[in-house]
Amino acid sequence: MKNGLTFALPKGTLFPDTVRLLYKAGFLKKEEVLLESRKLVIKDGPYTFIICRPTDIPTFVEHGAADLGIVGKDVIEEQRREIFELLDLKYGKCHFAVAAPRDNPKVHDLGKLTEVRAASKFPEVTRRFFKGLGVRAEVIKMHGNVELAPLVGLADVIVDLVSTGRTLRENNLIEITKIMDITARLVANRVAARVYDREIKAIVKKFKNLVGGEKNEVNLK
């Protein structure tokens, strides 16, 4: 295999499972190499690991600073960078959903709306979703506590990631509709995927054997 493949890895909630996957696949000698280090660039054997914010991973991969990356489907859908999506890694499960105040039934049936004001940390996903419904949407970009927006009259609905739904319930919000399921994905730089086709396919195979996933229909040549 190519000596020197570089992985971009996500800080935060996906990090422990990502490290575990890399270890089980044989790309790390010990999990502690990543879990106990405060370095942002770490070499272990022939591999280099860049530890960064999930939202920066598509940038590192697209521009060739990393050959491969592991990142949530939410980031991929929001940014739509020029990268290959190779494999569903089947962890970090949640979903995009539209939610609204329980006591505002006029926005519960999205099919009857002609316009809506939506708050989200994912404005591009939100715009595309409502455009697909034929609903004019004013999208307000949020950076945190998106559940607050409909409670104070800033928005009619929100589009956000939902896991257990507990945060929605605690804020008297209900899920109106699911937009799409979200999991961690393996992505690749387009040039690296062609130049190191054999090496990257071998990596995909190792991950696939562990997670039982199906490789997307992507032509790496």
Curated annotation (Swiss-Prot):
What's a GO cellular component annotated to this UniProt protein? cytoplasm
Per the UniProt entry, the signal peptide is none
Keyword rRNA-binding appears in the UniProt entry = no
Q: Under which EC number(s) is this enzyme classified?
A: 2.4.2.17
| Gene3D superfamilies assigned to the protein according to its UniProt record, in alphabetical order | Periplasmic binding protein-like II
The free-text function statement in the UniProt record for this protein reads: Catalyzes the condensation of ATP and 5-phosphoribose 1-diphosphate to form N'-(5'-phosphoribosyl)-ATP (PR-ATP). Has a crucial role in the pathway because the rate of histidine biosynthesis seems to be controlled primarily by regulation of HisG enzymatic activity.
Q: Which PANTHER family match?
A: ATP PHOSPHORIBOSYLTRANSFERASE, ATP PHOSPHORIBOSYLTRANSFERASE ATP-PRTASE
Q: What is this protein called?
A: ATP phosphoribosyltransferase
Top-level taxonomy: Bacteria, Bacillati, Bacillota, Clostridia, Thermoanaerobacterales
